[in-house]
């Protein structure tokens, strides 16, 4: 898992830390968990992340001490279980799989991402406020495009969405 995670981080130019979890699909038991960059528990005070280490080394005095402490605490934290995440971007994979399976979309379907999209009087933007323009399902996933996934969810419909929610076992305790 660590090797696959390191490869994915390098291949996709991930700037922040990343996390991977492998679970037993029938029981939900955690089989493996990894975060990158990892640190050497035999040298826990050595900052493993090269960029973080360079940023700390560029400082001096109290600023350096504060930055060093923050960098150490960041690398020690198990991101998989300690950080909070909004479920939206993670759930985009489930929304996509459900819509493809239901025939609500195909791999060739396209979606438009402009300034914003309105749902029930609330305007939604992409998290980085980029306008992706016309994009395929694959591009919408790559961009984690909020507007495209609002459109995909609308095509799927709320009843089918709820049915797939149950089909994926998301109403069952883990």
Predicted regions and their residues:
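Conserved, well-ordered alpha-helix/loop/beta-strand core segments that scaffold catalytic motifs
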Residues: 2-18
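Beta-lactam-recognizing serine transpeptidase/beta-lactamase-like catalytic domain environment
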Residues: 18-90, 94-174
């Amino acid at each position: 898992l660590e090797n696959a995670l390191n490869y994915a981080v390098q291949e996709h130019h991930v700037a922040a830390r990343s996390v991977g979890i492998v679970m037993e699909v029938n029981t939900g038991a955690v089989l493996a968990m990894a975060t990158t960059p990892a640190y050497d528990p035999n040298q826990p005070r050595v900052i493993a992340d090269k960029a973080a280490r360079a940023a700390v080394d560029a400082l001096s005095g109290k600023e350096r001490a504060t930055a060093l402490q923050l960098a150490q605490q960041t690398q020690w934290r198990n991101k998989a279980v300690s950080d909070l995440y909004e479920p939206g971007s993670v759930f985009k994979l489930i929304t996509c799989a459900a819509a493809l399976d239901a025939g609500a979309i195909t791999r060739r379907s396209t979606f438009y991402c402009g300034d914003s999209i309105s749902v029930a009087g609330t305007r939604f933007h992409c998290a980085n406020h980029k306008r992706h323009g016309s994009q395929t399902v694959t591009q919408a996933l790559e961009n984690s495009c909020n507007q495209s996934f609002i459109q995909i969810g609308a095509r799927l419909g709320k009843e089918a969405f709820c049915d797939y929610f149950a089909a994926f076992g998301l109403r069952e305790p883990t």
